[in-house]
Amino acid sequence: MSDISDANKLKHRFRGYFPVVIDVETAGFNSQTDALLEIAVTLLKMDDEGLLGIDKTLHFNIEPFEGANLEPEALAFNGIDPTNPLRGAVSEKEAFLEIFKAVKKAQKASDCHRSIIVAHNAAFDHGFVSKAIERCDLKRSPFHPFATFDTATLAGLAIGHTVLAKACIMAGIPFDNKEAHSALYDTERTAELFCHIVNRWKQLGGWPLLAAGESEDADGEE
């Protein structure tokens, strides 16, 4: 990076990775057997000052794949009725084709070379997303196959709490527990939390890093 304006570009902030915030609601914990029922995807943008913010969110209710397991306890927890026609559910393939299209467009606009999933307890969401992509036999996924940014871990470090609701409140982000466990609501709160942590780190002087030459110059100053 040649100057601060370069450091304030999204393509330089995460080594060319474009962060995509995702939340899923499912019919259980097993990504191989349990249905993916809902997914929301929040795309981010960076302003001229290098501050990260929400761009837009996509949301889909998903039809359970053929033969999917539906755990009653999971459905009771998230309140989803997979048989309700008012859900307007689409197939996994239809949803992910739209997601791929939007993510790749935003990734290209930011001059990034790949996207990386951001999620709260990211291994869970990444597992369900990866398995759905595999089931649909979709090629050229924009997402890194294993790397993620986990906001539970980041919040534990930066804020001192790993629970999404608690971390948001401690960060000054309103959180309504009555709206929680909706993929749309949780994704946008997760996105706000991720942006807060990234921006706070910048405001505290953690980014951009000083180049080696700049560091030596600073050490020599009285």
Swiss-Prot record:
InterPro entries on file: Exonuclease_RNaseT/DNA_pol3, RNase_T, RNaseH-like_sf, RNaseH_sf
Superkingdom assignment: Bacteria
Binding site for Mg(2+) 1: 23
Family: Belongs to the RNase T family.
Role this protein plays: Trims short 3' overhangs of a variety of RNA species, leaving a one or two nucleotide 3' overhang. Responsible for the end-turnover of tRNA: specifically removes the terminal AMP residue from uncharged tRNA (tRNA-C-C-A). Also appears to be involved in tRNA biosynthesis.
Quaternary assembly: Homodimer.
Protein name: Ribonuclease T
Source taxonomy: Bacteria, Pseudomonadati, Pseudomonadota, Gammaproteobacteria, Alteromonadales
